[in-house]
Amino acid sequence: MNELMNIFGQPQGPQSFDQIRISIASPERIRSWSFGEIKKPETINYRTFKPERDGLFCARIFGPIKDYECLCGKYKRMKYRGIICEKCGVEVTLSKVRRERMGHIELASPVAHIWFLKSLPSRIGLLLDMTLKDLERILYFENYVVIEPGLTDLKLHELLSEDQLLDKQDKFGEDAFTAKIGAEAMKDLLANLDLIEEKATCREELKETASEAKRKKLVKRLKLIEAFLGPSQEVEDVAAYERFEGYKERIERPDARPLFKIFPDATRPEWMILEVVPVIPPELRPLVPLDGGRFATSDLNDLYRRVINRNNRLKRLIELKAPDIIVRNEKRMLQEAVDALFDNGRRGRVITGANKRPLKSISDMLKGKQGRFRQNLLGKRVDYSGRSVIVVGPELKLHQCGLPKKMALELFKPFIYAKLELYGLASTIKAAKRMVEKERPEVWDILEEVIREHPVMLNRAPTLHRLGIQAFEPTLIEGKAIQLHPLVCTAFNADFDGDQMAVHVPLSLEAQLEARVLMMSTNNILSPASGRPIIVPSQDIVLGLYYITMELPGMVGEGMAFGTIGEIEHALASKAVSLHAKIQCRYKTVDDEGNPITVRVTTTPGRMLLSEILPRHKAIKFDLINRLLTKKEIGNIIDVVYRHCGQKETVIFADRLMKLGFSNAFKAGISFGKDDMVIPAEKEILIREAQDRVKEYEQQYLDGLITQGEKYNKVVDVWSETTEKVASAMMKVIEQPKPGFGVNSVYMMAHSGARGSAAQIKQLAGMRGLMAKPSGEIIETPIISNFKEGLTVLEYFNSTHGARKGLADTALKTANSGYLTRRLVDVAQDAIIVENDCGTTRGITMKAVIDGGEIVVPLGERILGRTVSVDIIHPLTGEMLVAAGDMITEREVEVIERAGIDSVHIRSVLTCETRDGVCAQCYGRDLARGTRVNMGEAVGVIAAQSIGEPGTQLTMRTFHIGGAAQRGAEQSFIEATLDAKVMVKNRNLVMNSEGVPVVMGRNCELALLDEQGRERARHRVPYGAKLNKALAADGAMIKKGDRLAEWDPYTLPILTEREGIANYVDLVEGVSVREVVDEATGISSKVVTDWRQQPRGADLRPRITLRDETGEVVKLPNGLEARYYMSVDAILSVENGARVRAGDVLARIPRESSKTRDITGGLPRVAELFEARRPKDFAIISDIDGRVEFGKDYKTKRRIVVRNDETGEEKEYLIPKGKHISVQEGDYVQKGDLLMDGNPVPHDILAVMGVESLANYLINEIQDVYRLQGVKINDKHIEVIVRQMLQKVEITDPGDTTLLAGEQVDRTEFEEENRLVQQRMNEGEQDLRFAIAKPVLQGITKASLQTRSFISAASFQETTRVLTEAAVQGKVDNLEGLKENVIVGRLIPAGTGSVVNRLKQIAAERDKALQLADGVDETPALADGGEAAA
């Protein structure tokens, strides 16, 4: 055995390392990697196909081509291992060394590395403080640069042309100064830089400069210089200081003993200029013979050949002392060749190969989806896997899948071989192999045994969330298709129309264990996105269950009574009773103590059959199933069963439900027939009414009472309303069972939630309604026919618009949604649960989500499964309901809701103070398990998947009314939802001429209070709304269903507050106002036009003032004069000099909805929010509380001043003149209120209102988009992503830290610096100041590129830029996140991997403690193996 060991060498264990460092390689280091210099551009000999000596594939340099055999064949076999053949110079060893041995090319003239020159910001340019343009002129031999000005009047780094140089040499003499050209010049410039001095001057300038731009530039430069210098060490030994080669500085100390600072890890700037080019191993750029004598080669060989050719030519020219101009040209060509090798196409023309295809350079090998990172390191292919079509397996249990025998035999081969040997059926592996290939009968028995309880993993692409891969126990089946359990289809998003799935076999015991414990389908009952069950029956099963729980009057056997379920089955079999008859029966259950009892229930035989499979538990009452079950109800039942009876019962229950559903759906014999779609008789009448109303609006338009836009809006409204009416009439007809026919089957399918929806039936049997144009506007003429009647040619043509758009959208959507998921995963991948409790007292306040007065999401749903941060006290009795630090479960939610609490303070990931991760308390419940979240759970990835997975269901764009076509009319009134007392908040009312109160304020709200005085609803009322007369007095009581307020949704009115005589000011005909004569009607109206475009209109401020009889301007209640400014497009409603009453309309501004401005909706809106972009029409928000005043306008902007009376502080805002301003002079605005229409900018919200408001805004906006599609996502997922977006802070005051003002650093780094200051204060230093910083919001792309791990960032986007920056800074990657560990091939630090990680950490800390105890402090230096170099 020892002999063998000696021959083969000890087996090498996998190299283990803790970090990876990347830095710029010095020429010496490149030479030290190399096994020889490559001198010739030849690759292989065309006759012998052996590599040429000293060429790109040279065997002497890179190693032998065949294992243990030199090139000339003198030495063969193992026994000559390690000998170098004296004839051909090749070492006898394994041929795989050709994958790791590198070579090099010695350049005749230095060249600049394109990454450091061109990757913006140019590193060389920053260091030398020169522009990229100047650098290129030096580099490509256009200008000389002064390197050493001597005593002349030239400046350092000054550029000179050839002629200028000669002039200066004549003037000062040739030796008076030094000027050079090309990369040598640049090398000298970099070598002469004294980084330590530069650093000092930069810091000085920073203190003195006032200009922001200059400061930014200096900070950038300073950071770069510090990155080059690296960390410093202090030495006191003079001799060591003298010996040290690199950067060093003396520090004078008051006690006269100098202290020396050396920078041992400093990177020399001149290394950015290459003297030696490394050549990568030949097996990584192979040359492969194809049949037919041709060769396929990697593009790199071409690029290297170019470099070698030009380099050799340059050497020859220099030896021949050729004229300067020729040598220069050759040097320039060499520079271009090296540029192309590193990054083809970055500078100048792209170098193309023989087939006009650009050559792939080293940078291209790393970049993009096909690059090294994403193709090979993050996306490896897997052995022991197969794929096949799936078919439905309704007789399987939930934890099983059907695996074709042929596939199983192939997948489990190694296990079968082992077993065959174990039982002595085969003497060797070879014999076993033969048996398996012949498919002998005993092989099948062994296969059965091997497969027993060995889970396999099934995956369906696209794997959008973690439920796309689940483990099942295989059962062997005949045939070639995989059988899948119907209930897991929702999770896989699978159907059986030809979908394929992949099977993977977990090999090791640990893998099998994880598959069984964590990934088994029975463990994934709840969805990780919302915590609702995902194993929910759908389609046929729902239909079957709906059918057996129906109760119909007048069926056979109605009113009978039964004692047991057996009797019912008997009666059903003998047709004595119908499934749907109303009967009485005994039901055995358990009472609250858990004792068995019998209750008498009124129900149907079908429901009794269902009750048989219901688990018996005190919390599961018979009422749960004693009703008509729709898909939603069934989901609720499964949820209740899971919460009370646990997982095992739920799985058994779900399986039984499925069996029951399928068998009854088939017995029901429900079919889909043309006559099931009934067209309502009222349809004709409704359509005729609508057409009459449309004619009336046309007439009003012709008479000039309404504008074109208003007519359009009204017509669209009428038609949407009519479509709804026809649809509801149709539903009424379909709902009623027809005598002798039973219930309408199409209605049953839709109502149960099995297939189809009311909207689809509406198109089949109602009317199709309005269609959208491609631009998103709605076509005024609706489609009156339905599909049953058939469309006319014109109608069909109109409907193709919308349909085609839908198809185009779907194609775009999938790609966009996938990209959003990728960005989310990348930003959140390192959010992992790393500790149990971070001990923070902070949190956020949760309220119910209320929209338009209705509670959309109740408080209970939002706080379920979160941790309370402040004790919850009952508002009336004062008893403690939930203590701080407890988790809110279903029980607590009930208690809180009963107490009528409307807001709860909870812990949140946003305020979690854990470093490098999140704590379990702040996260709360793991939604997929229903218990507190486990340590090591990768909550970031789960959040990203939960948000990204429904992305494909979101639309690409919702049209303002493309949505409204379905949404019915715009909201134009508020009705009371309950009997209540109404309080008017922020009252600002005026009685108009009819005595109706009109709202004059922008933030008027109606609060509805119940008997106890608790607020139950709150409605925002727009400016200009007419209120119910009863509301003139505060505290009026109103009845449910009363109209509280109404308004015109299509125009914004400008109202008067006093009576008086209207007087036009600056409304000049032809400049700021024009008569618009409607061609169709001949009626004219006055419209305010854009007066700023006119030369005469620059100083105008069109307005209407109110005067009294004497001609004085009327004063308003707040003491200001009554002036009303007009905005562009306002239509004047009063004539000059007309008398007006308070509350009358002076002008109307049409709302933009005729040409709907696309509200960015759907996916793009979600992406816009996560990327923290400025919305297209963003609104300006107020920074302070105060009153609004209008200042003097600028040319294109209006000035709004907000002044706070208490503090006297004021802020002014400039708003473009065309935009509609939503506040009026004298209005009181609060901090964070919008001053104009549009969406606010997230960064502004953060700056003005803080983190919690920002988070609330983002959560609500994102949830709105998902809610519209009916997708439930838990808030905490969005919080996790927002936390990742807020990782950085910007230093506003550096205090006494080493940070710089204005730089952005990680929050942890900032806290660390302040901790150091605190430490110094504890040690007794006086008057130190902490650094102060403000949070910075970054979009998800930017945040993922700024992670601490450069490997993770490089594998995401902009690979070259990330690597350049990392190399310059000499970054160290500590391999903390998931991605980095996948890339270097280790266990990820999440899930079970986090436990291993933790153990390693503990061991390392223990070793350190032991070392300290021994008094030895060995901090091992970085292993050379861990260093990469650019």
From Swiss-Prot:
CDD domains xref list: RNAP_beta'_C (cd02655), RNAP_beta'_N (cd01609)
UniProt xrefs under SMART domains: RPOLA_N (SM00663)
SUPFAM superfamilies registered for this protein in UniProt: beta and beta-prime subunits of DNA dependent RNA-polymerase (SSF64484)
InterPro entries: DNA-dir_RpoC_beta_prime (IPR045867), DNA-dir_RpoC_beta_prime_bact (IPR012754), RNA_pol_asu (IPR000722), RNA_pol_N (IPR006592), RNA_pol_Rpb1_1 (IPR007080), RNA_pol_Rpb1_3 (IPR007066), RNA_pol_Rpb1_3_sf (IPR042102), RNA_pol_Rpb1_4 (IPR007083)
Disulphide bond pairs: none
Binding of Zn(2+) 1, residues: C70, C72, C85, C88
Cofactors: Mg(2+); Zn(2+)
Keywords noted in UniProt: DNA-directed RNA polymerase, Magnesium, Metal-binding, Nucleotidyltransferase, Transcription, Transferase, Zinc
One Pfam family from the record: RNA_pol_Rpb1_3
Biological process terms in GO annotation: DNA-templated transcription
CC terms in the record's Gene Ontology section: DNA-directed RNA polymerase complex
GO molecular function: DNA binding; DNA-directed RNA polymerase activity; magnesium ion binding; zinc ion binding
Free-text cofactor note: Binds 1 Mg(2+) ion per subunit.
Reaction(s) catalysed by this chain's protein: RNA(n) + a ribonucleoside 5'-triphosphate = RNA(n+1) + diphosphate
Annotated Zn(2+) 2 binding sites: C838, C912, C919, C922
Residues given in the record as Mg(2+) binding sites: D495, D497, D499
EC number(s) given by UniProt: 2.7.7.6
NCBIfam families reported for this sequence: rpoC_TIGR
Family: Belongs to the RNA polymerase beta' chain family.
Function, in words: DNA-dependent RNA polymerase catalyzes the transcription of DNA into RNA using the four ribonucleoside triphosphates as substrates.
Subunit note: The RNAP catalytic core consists of 2 alpha, 1 beta, 1 beta' and 1 omega subunit. When a sigma factor is associated with the core the holoenzyme is formed, which can initiate transcription.
Identification of the protein by name: DNA-directed RNA polymerase subunit beta'
Native organism: Rhodospirillum centenum (strain ATCC 51521 / SW)
